[in-house]
Amino acid sequence: MVEKRFPAAGRDAMAYVLAGGRGSRLKELTDRRAKPAVYFGGKTRIIDFALSNALNSGIRRIGVATQYKAHSLIRHMQRGWNFFRPERNESFDILPASQRVSETQWYEGTADAVYQNIDIIEPYGPEYMVILAGDHIYKMDYEWMLQQHVDSGADVTIGCLEVPRMEAVGFGVMHVDDKDRIIDFVEKPADPPGIPGNPDFALASMGIYVFHTKFLIECLKRDAADPNSSRDFGKDIIPHIVKNGKAVAHRFTQSCVRSDFEREAYWRDVGTIDAYWQANIDLTAVVPELDIYDKSWPIWTYAEISPPAKFVHDDEDRRGSAVSSVVAGDCIISGASLYNSLLFTGVRANSYSKLEGAVVLPSVKVGRRAQLKNVVIDHGVTIPEGLVVGEDPELDAKRWRRTESGICLITQSMIDKLDL
């Protein structure tokens, strides 16, 4: 874990989490919930990582902007993030789109989602604003980024990842000088600029920005008055500052939080079914790339009161077992076998069923003799007895949402259409 060597800037900052996006590439997983509300890691939701990073970084004022199908996200935060105390100068504001500046205008972009709540932000008087995306998996101490922002005198400091240059085509990319001052910002370039001294890599935006609050509000008001703006940080606010002010890149390797078991700086955009499945399955490794057991940097969440997991039956062909798997509380593995799988709370896996490479969301019931391989099963699904998934690619593609790599997303509506 990184060690602080400077006065805490987090106490003078407010974190503002942008959590209104659908995440359409997750397909049916976001039919009923926003991407930040999607379950991750057996216990948490995706948004818990950005919120936990802020809390662990010493930030005690947090706002969360919501929009698309926000009920489950809001309910989760009301239950799990309701411990902030105003008498300690703490606050946690949930800010759903509510036409606050116009009777016809919802949040029209990421910048607009902050602009419409300026009157809520200003009374708190934060000196700095830390703008965060609420849909990524990573551990980061924002104090280091705040301190760089203060020391550099930048108008904006942007969190960046070093990625192979040809993988940067899907990101906003920073063209920097040898002191990491940003001299150009290009959104999803066909030919990303390389890093000085390391031309095979590019600096990709993490969607994390630090501003002085007064300067940010000036930028948002100017942008709101521009009829040609799309009201977006990446498309409008940041390019304007790069051109007319001082923008500095902050490299994730300088502030990522790693335990003794984590070798690399871990950041994932779990925005596709394949990426979501892989990031969850990664947690079943003996030494996972992401250490969610690090008590010095806990991932806070809402946890239901539930009994422990239970494994029953010990016959030769009917043994409740789990190998290289993560199993949450209130699961009953009744004569089923799990391998390289991750189960959320309340799953029931019945006799003779076999799960391999399965990511199983809460309250799923797996019928007897089901054979499930390389699947993501949505919340509350009932798997019929004897169902086989992962053996016949053509049949799977007809029944489920099957990716090119062979991962099948299964929802209850898909099950209901089966003619078994």
UniProtKB/Swiss-Prot annotation:
Biological processes per GO annotation: glycogen biosynthetic process
Amino acids binding alpha-D-glucose 1-phosphate: 107, 172, 187-188, 205
Keywords: ATP-binding, Carbohydrate metabolism, Glycogen biosynthesis, Glycogen metabolism, Nucleotide-binding, Nucleotidyltransferase, Transferase
Pathway(s) per entry: Glycan biosynthesis; glycogen biosynthesis
Catalytic activity from the UniProt record: alpha-D-glucose 1-phosphate + ATP + H(+) = ADP-alpha-D-glucose + diphosphate
Record-linked Pfam families: Hexapep_GlmU, NTP_transferase
One MF annotation (Gene Ontology) recorded for this entry: ATP binding
The EC number(s) this enzyme carries: 2.7.7.27
Gene3D superfamilies: Hexapeptide repeat proteins (2.160.10.10), Spore Coat Polysaccharide Biosynthesis Protein SpsA, Chain A (3.90.550.10)
Family stated for the protein in its record: Belongs to the bacterial/plant glucose-1-phosphate adenylyltransferase family.
HAMAP family according to UniProt: GlgC
PANTHER family tied to this protein: GLUCOSE-1-PHOSPHATE ADENYLYLTRANSFERASE, GLUCOSE-1-PHOSPHATE ADENYLYLTRANSFERASE-RELATED
Subunit structure: Homotetramer.
Function summary: Involved in the biosynthesis of ADP-glucose, a building block required for the elongation reactions to produce glycogen. Catalyzes the reaction between ATP and alpha-D-glucose 1-phosphate (G1P) to produce pyrophosphate and ADP-Glc.
UniProt name for this protein: Glucose-1-phosphate adenylyltransferase
Organism of derivation: Rhizobium tropici
